[in-house]
Amino acid sequence: MKKIWILLLTLSVLFVGCGDKNNKEDKIVIKYGLWDSVQEPVFRDLADQFEKENPNIEIEIENTPYSQYWTKLQASSTGGVAPDVIWMNGPSIMKYTEHKMLLPLDEMVKKDSIDLGKYVKGIKELYNYKGVQYGIPKDVDSQALWYNKDLFDKAGVPYPKNDWTWDDMKKAAIEIQSKLEGVYGIAIPFYDDQGSFYNIIPQNDGFIISEGKKTSGYGNPEAIKAIQMMRDLIDEKASPDYTTILENKATEMFQSEKVAMTYQGSWRASPLNSDEKINTHIGVVKMPKIKKSTTVVHGIGYAITKGTKHPEASWEFIKFLASKKANDFIAKSGITIPAYVESQNLWASNYKNIDVTAHINALKDNISYPVSLDTAKWSHVQNEYLAQVWTGTMSAEEACKKIKVEMDEILKKEK
Amino acid sequence: MKNKKTEQAFWGYLLIMPVFLGLMIFYIIPFFQNFYFSFTEIGIFGGSTWVGLDNYKKIFVDKEFWQSLKNTFKYVIIAVPLGISISTVLAVLLNTKIKFKGLFRTIYFLPVIAMASASGAVWKWIYNKDFGILNFCLSFFGFEHISWLNNPTTSLYAVVVVMIWMKIGYNMIILLAGLQSIPKSLYEAAKIDGASEIRQFFFITLPLLTPSLFFVGIMTLISTFQVFDIIYMMVNKYSIAINESTSVVSLFYRYAFEFNEKGYASALAAILFFIIIMITLLQFHIKKKWVHE
Amino acid sequence: MNKKIGKFMIYFTLICGGILSTTPFVWMLVTSLKTMGESTQIPPTMFPSKVMWNNYVEVFKLLPFGKYFINTLLSTLIMVIGQLVFCSMAGYAFARLQFWGKKKIFLVFLTILMVPGQIYLIPQYLIIQKLGLLNSLTALFLPGLFSAFGTFLLKQFFETIPRELEEAAIIDGCNPFQIYWRVMLPLIKPALITLAILTALYGWNSLMWPLIVNTSASKMTLSAGLASLAGQRTTNIPIMMAGSLVAMAPMLIFFIIFQKNFIEGIASTGSKG
């Protein structure tokens, strides 16, 4: 008989996992979903501050790696276990609002007199769908040119300047690559749209998607020329070839000092700033100008999922996160540039070793990240064809024309 | 007497109950569910609509599918015979009068213990075009740096090497056991008759090893058909080699959990099932022709 | 003379093969102790000039490796215990007890083995989703508690036990469960060890299932966590290598201690097949 008890005990081990469910009496538990391990500790601090001010609410952070974040969100929304407050981004906002998976926030904004004018306009508009506000702007990313002062010194090339043109950059890159053994001139992250061609095409006065989101800009000569210019960097020996960048990633190559320049997003500043081997000799300037000097901006928005059981508590948390106090805190930690304009300069001041004001200045001339209802579908096509250009198996013209045809078809099906 | 019968039945059903329920809920019913789903389209946020044979029709005209099928067959045709041959040779060598047998067995078994994530990570680094140790060694022979994993021509073969490397030890152990079960008396009799070592191998060892070879063959074939882990780890999503190295299961994963088209993916799984069943039945059918009973 | 050359060739081949087999692991170790800059040096260095033990600390800081480890350990342990208990119960019943439909039910179980695992994946995922168990420890081990293979394996072993041993217990008045628990189970210890090893190996190294059910950083397994580290926009190679070794280490140690059981167990699956 004793042995049967052992058997039952063994079986009860099964229910270890089921003990996951929270049984906290009287406390409201808000689940907060995000995807950045660098930012998580900062938000944990903020959550702790919020909990102190609101003792009946507990914040549980769910960190999901970006590559799984959207699959998981879709699955958990269907399963009714989605987080209450989430990070929403450009490529997905329209899908979620179209399928009514987010709570409209206008009433709460009005009731608490939140002034949305204090946030970067492009980001605010990104999360406004058909006149309704679904997201409160969290941050804004911008791109800039990062360069390694030591490598420039070694090659005897003068440092990049804020008024550099594309040709200036190319000349310097070619010179460094030819003079220094085992070092490349510039590594642009070809595989990352926000880090590369989403900036370069508009800088050449082209566009990715039309204002009405009905047509693709890839058929226009400006876009084709921009892609060709990027490809030329490889051919003219200013940049390593695509496979090298793909296998080793642009930032990693910059961090291991294998390349003198790179295009970098502001969210990447923090890890580079903490790398003592390199942070003593890094400089940052605006991306070189082609016909224009613009940069693409994108930013995350805080949103509330439709299925939440605690809409008021969720809103209180978002209100807290979007406040000046919280944004100052985020800016000072240096993890990201807040969309709350008044806090932005605090971000740059956090960087003692590197002068990152170029990222703030880039915000002055910006265009918003290109999205539509089914962004993932056409951006997949876009990336696939462009990859062929980067490896030299297809001409820029042919690839862009193919993208235009397929992208237009996808956009037509959306409406 | 009746008491005994009911006692047996009572305990019989009770003892199989957990496994019975578990297998029913998680395997048997899902088996039929998958076929049902293959005739539907499952919405992004839930709900399903009947679409009949649409998914199958789409698969039939999908270039990506046929390419992935071709790739999968390539993986099987190359990796299975090559891998088993190597395992057999190693098993035969280990079966001779040598020392350190245990050490060799352990060394060859190590890759089996490693998880695909870890193996994939290190092999990806070994294959790295600019800094990988493989290209460095090859450069001594005048080879240019090749991107093994991201070049469409070489990608599949690079993956095959890793696949074989991961399985050699496992098959070798099973074949070794098969070898050790061959009666020594047969070899002694052959030696008395004046047969050379090579003759002994082909006329005694190989025929009597065929049951083990059959077992290893089927297991390796089925698992190679389902290759996913190692491709997922080593071939970059944005690489132009992705088409030439994607397997059917890689495609299945992409549609089921990245594009979230679970109806389409279920149809892919169903097709994979039929192919594997056909091949397995074929294997059993020709078994009598070559396997020693 | 011929014999000596023969022996030499055998050792030579085995050693070469052995080197090819273990080189990736050696390289993993060497790379894990380098700095990022040194790992990308040409020509590659054989020994790190500055041994970066700190990389192993960084791994735990970068990702919740501690949590990965616990998730993997617990789910694997529960799976092993579950299978040992459930499959042995069912295996004994199929081997020794008579009840209506026994043969048919067992045949149905066998067909499960013939089907590629991907068929079950989507429906299993949807079941876990419906139960609200996505992203939990339970999701990791639940379907893995029940195995047709385990049942089959143990049934085979039970059938090899001489009936006389049972008869003694029957005369003593034991009911079938007591016979199973007190007599039969201890007698198939080697088979239980084999099943435990195979299940542990499978559970520890499994990638696709943990990858799709548990997506929160804190609920992932070592396998899936390592895979998501590789997929990020940047990859620090030495830290990645350190992470890989940390993930592999427990199973490696387990294997080295129980080598004999591993090898014998796996060899036996071939002969019973």
Locate each region found by the language model.
Chain B
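A structural signal for multi-pass alpha-helical bundles of membrane permease subunits
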Residues: 4-293
